Amino acid sequence: MAERVIITLACSVCKNRNYYFDRAKNHEGKLALKKFCKNCGKRTDHKETK
């Protein structure tokens, strides 16, 4: 079974870290989702950060 790691999703506009997820450590590539940013007040791209 793959080890899980905690990742943070940061807004690509204001760089505010809004969401936390866990995923398998052996996953390749960075996660990018369109989520709501409380700081910007709209849906923006959120990209994975450590």
Swiss-Prot record:
SUPFAM superfamilies with a match to the protein in the record: Zn-binding ribosomal proteins (SSF57829)
Keywords tagged on the record: Ribonucleoprotein, Ribosomal protein
Protein name stated in the entry: Large ribosomal subunit protein bL33
Phylogenetic lineage: Bacteria, Pseudomonadati, Elusimicrobiota, Endomicrobiia, Endomicrobiales
GO CC, one annotated term: cytoplasm
GO biological process: translation
Family in the record: Belongs to the bacterial ribosomal protein bL33 family.
InterPro entries, alphabetized: Ribosomal_bL33, Ribosomal_bL33_sf, Ribosomal_zn-bd
Source organism (scientific name): Endomicrobium trichonymphae
Entry GO MF terms: structural constituent of ribosome
